[in-house]
Amino acid sequence: MEKLTYYQEITFNGKKQKRKKEEVIKMTGKVTKMHSTKNYDVLLENDQEIKAYISGKMSLHNIKLIPGDMVDVEISPFNLTLGRIVFRHK
């Protein structure tokens, strides 16, 4: 489990500044069930099952997932039952 911090670039008085956007928890899991082309059930490495959706870049590049695929999931600390799939392992 690893914590990642995303930064958002904003302009204030003509100067670009970075602002913390969100801290996420990154975990590895296995796709167990496919609800639609974008919604999945993922079993995490700590034996917790969550619902997850495909990130925008994955759907843009038509990356398909099937049950049994190993994936990286980012989870917000505010809602630990919903995640975003950001990478599919080969």
Swiss-Prot record:
GO terms for cellular component: cytosol. Pfam families: eIF-1a (PF01176). It is found in: Cytoplasm. Its main location: cytoplasm. GO terms for molecular function: ribosome binding; rRNA binding; translation initiation factor activity. Signal peptide: none annotated. Belongs to the IF-1 family. PANTHER family: TRANSLATION INITIATION FACTOR IF-1, CHLOROPLASTIC. Component of the 30S ribosomal translation pre-initiation complex which assembles on the 30S ribosome in the order IF-2 and IF-3, IF-1 and N-formylmethionyl-tRNA(fMet); mRNA recruitment can occur at any time during PIC assembly. One of the essential components for the initiation of protein synthesis. Stabilizes the binding of IF-2 and IF-3 on the 30S subunit to which N-formylmethionyl-tRNA(fMet) subsequently binds. Helps modulate mRNA selection, yielding the 30S pre-initiation complex (PIC). Upon addition of the 50S ribosomal subunit IF-1, IF-2 and IF-3 are released leaving the mature 70S translation initiation complex. NCBIfam families: infA. This is Translation initiation factor IF-1. It comes from Mycoplasma sp. The gene is infA.
